UniProtKB/Swiss-Prot annotation:
It comes from the Bacteria. The gene is rexB. It comes from Streptococcus pyogenes serotype M49 (strain NZ131). The keyword ATP-binding applies. This is ATP-dependent helicase/deoxyribonuclease subunit B. SUPFAM superfamilies: P-loop containing nucleoside triphosphate hydrolases, Restriction endonuclease-like.
Length: 1071
């Protein structure tokens, strides 16, 4: 064995490549070993350093791949053992054990997390060269007993099913120990680069290779100063020193110092020396030189998005200077936090990149389909799971529009659970769903699922056969082929499909002769699919490489950007979680030789120093280290390592907001420039410097000129939210000439509430999702129907009997039976409605001086100027003197307010008066009013009553009164009825004013509607809060930002309020 170390200013790869070339020139076969995470990059680096740029004598690979070169022909033809297969084997082993057999883990037998931990422990034992019987000294002896039972049973199953229990390295080591590879290894030289520690498995293999190979050469970075130190605790080279010292002591050799022809920039060497002096308690009498600072940058940004944008702009600048994408490396402090943001931003700046991290398959449609299938079976046909299966695009041959219609109906009819899915759809609504088509679709969905889900506990082989038959019926394979739209998607689909078929094969192999339930089968398949990952290879070598910073090696690229280096992530604190604690691992390691667990937490300090050292030397030309003040929406501090660099004299540059400028990095890329022009068009120029204002104003002026030539424009508005008028063609279709515009009191109220709401409801005809469950609309229909029946009954029956009959016959109507007898909640709602009817009905019995002459009266009111107002009057009453009035039933409290009417928000009663005047063409003297009747079950606070007497009854009836607009002429006739006339009496002239102003409201609204421009203007009564419908989800209206767009209501003092509003009405309606 030969141990080589060198300073950070030299290239260890060049030194080892020279050693490899010498061996190859002598006729030896050379294996150049690199860590798993670096083998691809190391291969490219090694081939670059070879004069001939390639050779068959030097193979750059990993330990695992090297073992296959030697054992591929002699390895036994056994089944491959991966993580999913291991999980299935442990699941089967736990199935065969009873809870009382496992005192410590009996309650976790079916826990998926526990099974994952068993898989990890088993793999750790293999890597550590340990068996389960070596787990002595655990905190609880029963833990070892339980683990022995589980793992021994699992290993028995592996033997029975002919699975290969040995890892590739174990098979390689066994072949070496048996002398099967002596001739080959005697002509082999092994060169190892990039390691600072070996696992127990690698350590054991290395001892065998050292005894059998021609030579083993290992290189590592250690400074001469550090190598001569006797005390190395806390030294930045501590990990490498321990690594070399352990090997030197074990193999009785002395490491040699070597240098390379390539020497990197002195700036990085000087920074490394300062870093080393800080941690080895020595001092230096010099500082970084001024020109050294040109190679380092410390950035501080506010948040991640700005940080990534600054990096992207800097990369564009490097390209402008003539560098290539492959010369740039981006390192992430927190891979999970940055992974979702960095892709879209790099795409915006047109920067091709390769993210060096396996991508989980969890978002693939096949994985989502399997998960939805398993949940559908487990949760008894839950609607969301059935719909997710359909939306995956892998179930049957359904168009998106068909799936949308099916989803809409199942939500309306509240279809959930097997019982409802298995029965034909019969309930319909005003939208007239195509029940015949939906039932055909329901059968296509239900029949294959029902056939699969009815499977009882049986052999695993039989379950797999039924599952495959189900997948054929729904055309899963054909649908998978239709998913791909690009070559990358085709490759991903192939990986997912292979993973899926491998899992089915493993399940059939392991559980083929075991009886288990379908739910267990689907759960195991789902777990295997969700844990799988894509292995994507970059389509080209000229890309920006992105990976986690702790995987970096010295001198990786000319330009390196390390971002997200906050205190929480740099350094990283790794803590192991599993079935064994770190303390238990440490006790086991004390009594083993060549066999030991890796304890990450025990090596955090020296590993982090090693990582920081590699990071500070990762670039050969320029290193940028960046930290955001906010990461994952949490404030974080500077890394202690970055604070050290600041103490060395490196300035911390506050990059601030990503302001627009005319630098090459801003305007040299089309997509980035376009996105910035859009951004600047939305913001105020006052945020910029004068020079920037002039530049961007000129750019926008030129852009608008070019857009005008192309008949395009950049919209401008004084408001944050703006709407466009409808085109002439759309206006002609929506509001054709010669056809009256149809309005109603409700439509008018919506218009004056928020014009855009009118556009959505009455122009686009958008409706809220319907539901079979009773809501306020259906409750109102029920109450109207009962009172309509009651008032039509002119028999001599007692009033209470009439009421009972009206309730009974209304409850027997098929629509109300479907609505109110569907479940206990609906039945409870019906009981409340019946109480409301019984409480409100007595008011009808008391008013014996009125006669109901019509109910549910439809009307069409011609307002002139091609405006037709339509509606339904609930009830028309006639007093003893022949005067007419209207009653509108309400399920909530309502009363007429002249101010609300003036602002267009309460036109209903006046509109009904106008319609009644048209229906019964009499003088206005014969109209006694229009009123609301609140259908309610009055609630009284008994604490306010000293005793139960007539005052209690009077209070109940006081709540049951008619409230609205009443003619002053008829007040004598109204005084004997349940009419609340206080402050509600109007003279004939005042009634005429109300009617004329009501017409004016309709004409004004119709004129605006026909223009086709609808504003986002919910009303505000005080200018501080918005009461109108804001439609935030659609309009993004924010009261604090868009108050200027709200319509301010006219409000007047309470004193003389009525007279003042009437005066305004006369003025505006030109009376």
């Amino acid at each position: 064995m030969k141990l080589i170390y060198t300073e950070m200013s030299y290239s260890m790869t060049e030194i080892l490549v020279n050693e490899a070339r010498k061996a190859a020139d002598q006729g030896y076969r050379v294996f150049y070993i690199a860590p798993n995470s670096l083998s691809f990059e190391k291969e490219r680096e090694v081939l670059t350093l070879l004069p001939e740029r390639g050779t068959f004598s030097i193979i750059v690979t990993r330990f695992v791949q090297m073992s296959r070169y030697f054992t591929v022909e002699s390895s036994p033809s056994k089944q491959h053992l991966d993580d999913t297969t291991l999980a299935m084997i442990f699941y089967r082993a736990l199935m065969q054990l009873k809870p009382e057999d496992l005192p410590s883990y009996g309650r976790l037998q079916n826990n998926s997390v526990f099974i994952e931990q068993l898989v990890e422990l088993y793999k750790e034992l293999k890597n550590a060269q340990l068996s389960v019987h070596d787990l002595t000294g655990l905190d609880h002896p029963q833990k070892q007993e339980d683990l022995i039972k589980i793992i021994e049973l699992a290993e028995t199953i592996m033997i029975q099913q002919d699975y290969n229990q040995d890892s590739p390295l174990q098979s390689f080591a066994r072949a070496i120990k048996l002398g099967l590879l002596n001739n080959q290894l005697s002509k082999t030289v092994v060169v190892i680069d990039g390691f600072s520690r070996f696992s127990a498995e690698e350590d054991y293999l290395l001892s065998l290779l050292n005894n059998n190979c021609q030579e083993v050469i290992i290189g590592s970075y250690v400074s001469q100063k550090a190598y001569q130190k006797s005390f190395i605790k806390g030294n930045i080279y501590e990990a490498s020193l321990h690594f070399l010292q352990d090997l030197a002591q074990k193999y009785h050799i002395k490491p040699v110092f070597a240098t390379s022809n390539q020497v990197f920039k002195p700036a990085f060497s000087r920074l490394t020396q300062l870093f080393e002096a800080t941690h080895d308690f020595s001092q230096v009498d010099w500082q970084l030189q001024k020109n050294d600072l040109d190679h380092f940058s410390l950035w501080q940004c506010h948040h991640q998005k700005e940080e990534i944008e600054h990096v992207a702009k800097s990369i564009r600048q490097k390209l402008y200077e003539g560098y290539r994408y492959k010369d740039i490396l981006v390192l992430l402090g927190d891979m999970d936090a940055y992974q979702l943001q960095i892709g879209p931003i790099f795409d915006k700046f047109e920067i091709p990149y390769y993210l060096g991290k396996a991508e989980p398959m969890a978002a693939h449609p096949l994985v989502q389909f399997i998960e939805s299938l398993e949940r559908s079976q487990r949760y008894n046909w839950r609607r969301e799971d059935i719909l997710n299966m359909l939306k995956s695009g892998l179930f049957g041959c359904f168009d998106d529009s068909d799936i949308d219609r099916f989803e809409e109906y199942t939500q309306f009819a509240d279809i959930k659970g097997f019982t409802k899915f298995s029965k034909p759809f019969t309930i319909n609504s005003s939208r007239q769903y195509p029940l015949d088509f939906l039932n055909e679709m329901r059968q296509d969905i239900v029949l294959p699922l029902q056939e699969l889900f009815k499977s009882q506990k049986q052999l695993g082989a039989s379950l797999v056969d039924k599952l495959i038959l189900f997948l054929k019926k729904i055309r899963l394979a054909e649908n998978m082929q239709g998913l791909a739209q690009s070559q990358l998607e085709v490759e991903k689909n192939e990986e997912v499909w292979k993973r899926f078929t491998d899992i089915l094969t493993s399940f059939h192999h392991i559980f083929g002769q075991e009886k288990l339930r379908l739910s267990d089968c689907l759960a195991l398949i789902k777990t295997g699919m969700k844990s799988a990952q894509y292995r994507v290879v970059p389509a080209t070598l000229d890309v920006v490489t992105i990976k986690s910073y702790d995987l970096v090696q010295p001198h990786s690229k000319p330009f390196v950007y390390a971002i997200g280096l906050t205190q929480s992530h740099f350094p990283k604190q790794i803590h192991h979680s599993g079935l064994l604690s770190d303390q238990e691992r440490a006790r086991i390691n004390e009594i083993r030789n060549y066999r030991h667990f890796d304890i990450a937490s025990a090596e955090n300090s020296k590993k982090n120093h090693q990582t920081a050292l590699s990071l500070f030397n990762a670039a050969t030309k320029e290193l940028v280290l960046s930290v955001p003040t906010v990461i994952n929406e949490t404030f974080d501090d500077l890394s202690p390592y970055l604070k050290e660099l600041i103490n060395f004299g490196l300035p911390l540059l506050d990059k601030g907001k990503n302001y627009l400028s005319y630098d090459n990095s801003d305007i040299a890329n089309y997509k980035a420039l376009l996105s910035q022009i859009i951004a600047i068009n939305r913001q105020d120029l006052i945020e910029m410097a004068d020079q920037d204002k002039m530049f961007w104003t000129g750019v926008l002026r030129y852009l608008r000129k070019q857009l005008r030539k192309q008949q395009l424009e950049l919209p401008t508005s004084d408001y944050r939210l703006s709407t466009k008028p409808l085109s002439k063609e759309v206006i002609e279709v929506c509001f054709p000439k010669g056809i009256p515009l149809k309005l109603s009191a409700t439509a008018l109220t919506v218009f004056y509430n928020n014009q855009y709401n009118y556009f959505l409801k009455y122009v686009l005809n958008l409706n809220k999702t319907e539901s079979i469950h009773p809501d306020s609309r259906i409750h109102g229909q029920y109450l109207h129907r009962v009172f309509e029946r009651l008032m039509k009954d002119h028999t001599q029956e007692p009033f209470d009997n009439k009421l009972k009959q009206a309730i009974y016959h209304t409850n027997q109507e098929s629509f109300f039976q479907q609505v109110y007898q569907d479940n206990a909640e609906a039945e409870y709602s019906l009981a409340i409605l019946e109480d409301i009817v019984r409480s409100t009905a007595p008011i009808l019995q008391l008013n014996q001086n009125i006669q109901v002459i019509d109910q549910e009266k439809n009307f069409q009111l011609d307002m002139g100027n091609e405006i037709l107002v339509h509606g339904i009057i609930d009830r028309i009453d006639q007093l003893s003197d022949g005067s007419l009035g209207i009653v509108d039933y309400k399920s909530s409290a309502n009363q007429f307010d002249i101010g609300t009417f003036y602002n267009g928000l309460s036109p209903q009663l006046v509109t009904y008066l106008a319609a009644l005047k048209q229906i019964a063409p009499h003088d206005i003297n014969q109209l006694f009013g229009a009123m609301y009747l609140h259908l309610q079950d009055p609630k009284l606070d008994l604490v306010t009553f000293k005793q139960i007497d007539n005052t209690l009854v009077e209070s109940i009836y006081k709540a049951l009164t008619y409230k609205g607009i009443f003619s002053e002429v008829e007040k004598e006739h109204l005084s004997t009825g349940a009419y609340q006339t206080k402050n509600a009496l109007y003279s004939n002239d005042e009634l005429e004013t109300l009617l004329n102003y009501n017409k004016y409201l309709y004409l004004k609204a119709a004129k605006h509607i026909k223009k086709g421009h609808f504003l986002i203007n919910p009303y505000t009564s005080d200018g501080k809060t918005v009461q109108g419908d804001q439609l935030k989800a659609i309009t993004r209206f924010e009261a604090d930002l868009d108050m200027g767009q709200a319509r301010r209501l006219v409000t007047l003092p309470a004193k003389e309020k009525k007279e003042c509003f009437l005066t305004l009405m006369r003025k505006e309606s030109h009376l």
